[in-house]
Amino acid sequence: MADNVTPLASLSLTHVYYNPDDPISLLCAWLALVPQALCVVYATLIWSTREAEVILMFAGQLACEAANFALKRLIKEERPARIHSTGGKGYGMPSSHAQFVSFWAVALGLFLLARHTPREQQQQQQQKQKQRERKKQVTNVKTTTTNGSGNGSLFKTLTDSATDLERYAHEPWSFAHRFVASLGALVLAGAVAWSRTYLGYHTEKQVLVGCGAGTLCAVAWFVVTHVVRQSGLLGQILDFPVVRWFRVRDLVVEEDLPQAGWEKWEEQRVARREVEERKKAL
């Protein structure tokens, strides 16, 4: 009876071996889950924004994974002996984790530094911000007249501080902001790649080759998507009935992701406050 029992297998997608007595090893085990977390981020952004650029980046990420799958079976280099003896599956050259995060970091950096140019949006935001500031100034004058000079001045100071904070939060990222974000992505990618050698899943050579392959795939994919955009092919694809049915758009190149729907929300918020003020006046 016992001989007929099928031996169990583990799902290695999130199965990470680490040293429980080493806190750095535990951190590296969590870093090993970054690619899975990024896939969740991709899926969430695609579903919530329907942005063509996000879809293109995820398509490139999948193509990079396919290249890693092919390279591993072409090179057929084993993993380090220590991890191989514990049951580590698959070939080790190049590191799929290193290739995945390298593609993501480089592709994100190329988008933020070379493709994302929210110029027109910045001008529109500045005009709308000035209009909101004029309305707030009128409100401040009324408040000062009603509450007296002392209370009104304090209220005006607090309102001005809130306005400055709101203006900063709603401004599109400058090149310096985008550079820092790109640098942060590279640091995270480097940490994930380093964790693979620390845990013993790959040799340094396998990780470096993975980083190089991911970087090469990201640059090549950026060139491909640039040609697709410049040739007008992307615009034609976005006009397909099926694509329009899914409401795919291409705004993030010139618009920040948080900006989508913000003007509509602001208009509704202002309209709601005006209705409340009219009710109070009655």
Curated annotation (Swiss-Prot):
Query: What is the official name of this protein in its record?
Result: Putative dolichyldiphosphatase
Q: Taxonomically, what lineage is the organism?
A: Eukaryota, Fungi, Dikarya, Ascomycota, Pezizomycotina
User: What metabolic or biological pathway is this protein involved in?
Assistant: Protein modification; protein glycosylation
Organism, by scientific name, is: Neurospora crassa (strain ATCC 24698 / 74-OR23-1A / CBS 708.71 / DSM 1257 / FGSC 987)
Q: Which family does it belong to?
A: Belongs to the dolichyldiphosphatase family.
What Enzyme Commission number(s) appear in the record? 3.6.1.43
Mark out the compositionally biased spans (Low complexity): 138-148
- Membrane topology designation: Multi-pass membrane protein
Q: Which residues cross the membrane?
A: 26-46, 93-113, 173-193, 207-227
Please give the GO cellular component terms listed in this UniProt entry: endoplasmic reticulum membrane
Q: Name one Pfam family in it.
A: PAP2
